[in-house]
Structure formats: C-alpha cells, structure tokens
Amino acid sequence: MATKRELEGQLAVVAGFEDPQAALEQYPTPPALAAHVIHLADLHDDIEGRTVVDLGTGTGMLTLGAALRGPARVIAVELDGSPLATAVENRRRVGTRTPIHWLQADATQLPLSIPEPVTVVMNPPFGAQDGREGADRGFLSTVASVASVSYSVHNAGSEAFIEAFADDNGGEVTHAFSAAFTVENQFAHHDDTQREIDTEVYRIEWTN
C-alpha cells in the first residue's frame, strides 16, 4: 500500500477546475490535504472494502484518493457537470480500477439509498461567499442520513458548530485537527497568486 507521501504524489496529476464558479465555492482540494484525510481514514479501517461516498467531488481529488486505498466502490456526487467530466478524465490519469459511480446530483438532496455501511469523505462549500453562509450544513445533513463515519473539511473556527450539529443528529466527533489549505488565484477577488486558509478536518461517527 502506498504511503501518505506516495498517495500525495499519485494525486498530483489530478486536474483542477477549468472554469471554477465562485458562487459554488469551487476550490480544488490540495493533494497533500486529500492524502492526509484519506490516509487517516485508512488507518481507522474506514476505506478498505467499504462503500465510500464523496459529496461535492469537484474534479475528483478525494474520490480518487479513496479509490487508491481498496474500497469496494466509490460514489462521487457533483452538481456541476463540467468538473464531473474532468473527474472522469482524472480517473484515467490516476489509473485506478476501483469501481467508481459518477453521479450528477445535488449532494444536499441525495437521490439514492445505500443499504451498506458508508464512509463519507468531503470538502463541502465553506459558506464564505455572500448568500452562502452555512452552505456546509446541507452537506452535513446528507452525511447524517447516509454515513456510519465521515471525514470532512471545514473553515477554521467551526468546532462549536460541528460538535453541536453532530450531537443533534446522532453523531460524535472522534478526531479533529487543523490543516492548511492552499488556494490558488482563480477568481477576480483574489489579489495574491496563492494564499493559505486555515481549515479543520473532522472525523465523526454516526448512528442512523
């Protein structure tokens, strides 16, 4: 099995958004962060042989990271058809043979029922854009309804919200850690070539 560093290298070929939409907060998950999240999930036996669901897969970074760690299958959900098409191409670049089901759908209104235990991995919208406040709440509601365990990336300072949401919806935060998230200049309101934003990653166990 690849080490975390090797997994990061495998994910370095994943192409990002061709035409990112600021309103949808389409920022590619950095390979280093994706590898860290997937490696942690693997250490907890939450990937191998399981069904993994990536809500808001974008161009497939977390989906493909999970696919490289031996799951039974991965279900990748994305509302925007353009990055989803890029994700399908990224699968070819990465070279995984794990079954991946690409689903163009709203992750906050998931149109399927999954009978087996599910691990969710996701980097949802942070709700940083005007009118998008609390955008990750809808994603978490889906997680609470389908997952037995989840790994999700959120804006720094989300601890109280995440813990309260988990408590109210049959979940328990078991692990949390800070992580740097490098954002490239891809929108008109970005002044720097790139910048780092502070994020937090949460592992939550759910009873549903």
Predicted regions and their residues:
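Conserved Rossmann-like nucleotide-cofactor binding loop
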Residues: 82
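S-adenosylmethionine
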Residues: 107-203
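Conserved SAM-binding loop
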Residues: 87-88
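Conserved SAM-binding loop of SAM-dependent methyltransferases across substrates and taxa
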Residues: 59-71
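Conserved S-adenosyl-L-methionine
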Residues: 56
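S-adenosyl-L-methionine
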Residues: 1-53, 62
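Conserved SAM-binding motif I beta-strand of class I
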Residues: 73-78
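Conserved SAM-binding strand-loop segment of SAM-dependent methyltransferases
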Residues: 96-107
